[in-house]
Regions:
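Accessory nucleic-acid engagement/destabilization modules that flank
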Residues: 5-6, 10-20, 26-225
Length: 225
């Protein structure tokens, strides 16, 4: 059947051009977005506000690793067979001149968000802060970013991550993602660790004057060195 064929052939696609129906492989799309995002992050110079000498670090102060990680995980959920069935059917309809459905009804952003949120739990409260930040970016990368909490004090992100109906095929998606991209979970963990350090600098960058001094004094309470 179609699902077995997609798995066997690794025929995962991200999208296609409507003028000539050329498909773009999902792994190609992810790598291109990751590369562009990393390049954008590399241009963010946090040293303009934060003194690296004060932070006892000689590392480059950019968001390169953070945005690289977000780019890598943003379409994690498109490895869902549900999404692949939809996009392959849309490609067929386009070739046959049939009107597009336009909306898949599949929440592909939640998959990568769940992955990074779960991973962040291994790194204590500070890792969780960064994990929740990145999970929001990944989960809502098509827009609609909500407040951190609603009027009832609930987190829209956590409610979305805990909705099992959205993630019934999560394990299958994770296996397909790592197999197709030929990367390891250890590689993602290394990116995450570097992201934690970058976000630490970003937090300090947002502080000025006496507020910045207080932030630096209490830095150990927020981010580990």
């Amino acid at each position: 059947n179609e699902e077995k064929r997609i798995h066997k052939m690794n025929d995962y696609i991200a999208r296609f051009r409507v003028n000539d129906f050329e498909k773009q492989e999902l792994k190609e799309h992810i790598r291109e977005v990751q590369k562009l995002a990393a390049a954008m992050g590399k241009r963010v110079d946090l040293r303009r506000t934060v003194s690296l000498k004060e932070l006892h670090s000689d590392k480059k102060a950019t968001l390169e690793n953070t945005l690289s990680l977000v780019g890598l995980l943003h379409d994690f959920g498109k490895y869902s067979i549900k999404f692949q069935r939809f996009i392959h059917e849309e490609w067929r309809r386009a070739k046959e001149g049939i009107e597009s459905k336009r909306q898949s009804g599949i929440d592909h952003g939640v998959y990568g968000a769940k992955y990074i949120y779960d991973l962040s739990g291994k790194y204590g409260p500070n890792g969780r802060i960064v994990g929740e930040l990145l999970a929001n970016v990944i989960c809502y990368h098509h827009g609609g970013l909500p407040d951190a909490e609603d009027f009832n004090g609930d987190s829209p992100l956590l409610m979305r991550l805990q909705d099992e109906n959205r993630l019934t095929d999560y394990e299958q998606v994770k296996v397909a993602f790592f197999k197709d991209l030929q990367i390891t979970e250890q590689e993602i963990e290394q990116l995450f660790k570097k992201s934690v350090e970058e976000i630490k600098l970003l937090i300090l960058k947002s502080s000025t004057g006496s507020e910045a001094k207080n932030k630096r004094k209490n830095d150990a309470n927020f981010m580990p060195n």
